[in-house]
Amino acid sequence: MLNASLRQLSLLLSEKKISSTELTSEFLSRIKALNPDLNAFITIDEEKSLDQANVADKMIAAGRSTPLTGIPIAQKDIFCARGWLTTCGSKMLSNFVSPYDATVVERFDQAGMVNLGKTNMDEFAMGSSNETSYYGPVKNPWDRLAVPGGSSGGSACAVAARLAPAATGSDTGGSIRQPAALCGISGIKPTYGLVSRYGMIAFASSLDQGGPMAKSAEDLALLLNTMVGFDERDSTSLQRAEENYTQDLEKPVNGLRIGLPKEFFAEGMSSDVSNVIEAALAEYRKLGATFVEVSLPNSKLAVPVYYVLAPAEASSNLSRFDGVRYGYRTAQYSSLEDLYTKTRAEGFGEEVKRRILIGTYVLSHGYYDAYYLQAQKLRRLIAEDFRKAFEQCDLIMGPTTPTVAFNIGEKCDDPIQMYLSDIYTSTASLAGLPGMSIPAGFGSKNRPVGLHIIGNYFREAQMLNVAHRYQQVTNWHELTPPETSN
């Protein structure tokens, strides 16, 4: 059951060959056994999870089930869930129990899914390695010495180690796709505005987007069918006709024009990653796809642009955490200003403080025009590069990350090297485009490599179809980490 797809689990549940209670108990037992080492989950609540499973079993018995009813899911700890500790990986929210559900959580609850727990993450989603969490680093299940990627490292680890059949993630500059690649699973960041951000704790509001993480593209399609939809509580939510992301999965891909940006295949990519990506592209050639060289000339500016805009928005968003209404509050203070200063100094970690300082600096008088406005102009140029590229191709492909997972602690003292982990993913984020990563093989030290697929706006169904066809002729997505398979 641990390796079953969501469709297979759905069939077993609907045919009453297993109950949701049995399935949930099996995953909870596995979490208990493996989580002390992997640290993928911050919070588990067996009683709550089993209560939800019991409700799901009743839904199935009454004939009121959906394709996802009874299936457990892990929620990234950035999503508010009523009655659950919701920490965002920070000391600042270490005692915060959410009084309401995020729309994403609410939609999965209504579909009858079971919340297995809240997964570990980089503090306030700021990080590329899941090392900035107040709750300690997450280990990569393929190699316990390696990082799982970030910021959705707990979710990626949970799916890869079969602690959960699916998980939610959030992506600001690559936080779904990068950990999906480094942990050998599938993950998709939809077009900005497709998935509601209501109840998803904000990092950079013009970039943040929730999305699913699972073993395969087919699983992602099933999850997106529930996740996507207009929400009037989110002012950036898009109102579009409902789409079924599973209906075109089997379409042939012959004649598909795949764009290969020359900038993505230049220096910076390690040879082991390059070899895996070349082999993946060869599979698409066999499937009948054609390749077109395209150019994204401003992509080299994506990381500096991202690290001006995202911290600027973060410095504003995180100003709400001051110890007054909720969250951590310093024990001793002499005035209101002292309360603010000590609470934020003690409650935020080093990386979060660094980004707040950068953001405050680029928004300050005298630097706003030089940094923030310039970055906004360059962001538009990056989006324009993609517009021109998509006139020549249907999809864009390349590596998700320049290297395989690095070792825990390797880049902690070098923020610039850490930030460059987002070099391929931040471009799509800045343009608001959908991007996904699927497992494509293994590089050095037998660590996973991800293939990055970028689609035009609202082309998630096409991306999932293209990924699914690849997964029908390869088995990378079915492999399990050796130390966690039993």
From Swiss-Prot:
GO terms of biological process kind: translation
Active site: K76, S151, S175
Record key words, sorted: ATP-binding, Ligase, Nucleotide-binding, Protein biosynthesis
EC number: 6.3.5.7
Any one Pfam family match given in the protein's UniProt record, by short name: Amidase
One Gene Ontology term of the molecular function aspect: glutaminyl-tRNA synthase (glutamine-hydrolyzing) activity
Broad class of enzyme this protein falls into: ligase
Its job: Allows the formation of correctly charged Gln-tRNA(Gln) through the transamidation of misacylated Glu-tRNA(Gln) in organisms which lack glutaminyl-tRNA synthetase. The reaction takes place in the presence of glutamine and ATP through an activated gamma-phospho-Glu-tRNA(Gln).
NCBIfam families per the UniProt record, alphabetical: gatA (TIGR00132)
Subunit structure: Heterotrimer of A, B and C subunits.
Family, per entry: Belongs to the amidase family. GatA subfamily.
Record's protein name: Glutamyl-tRNA(Gln) amidotransferase subunit A
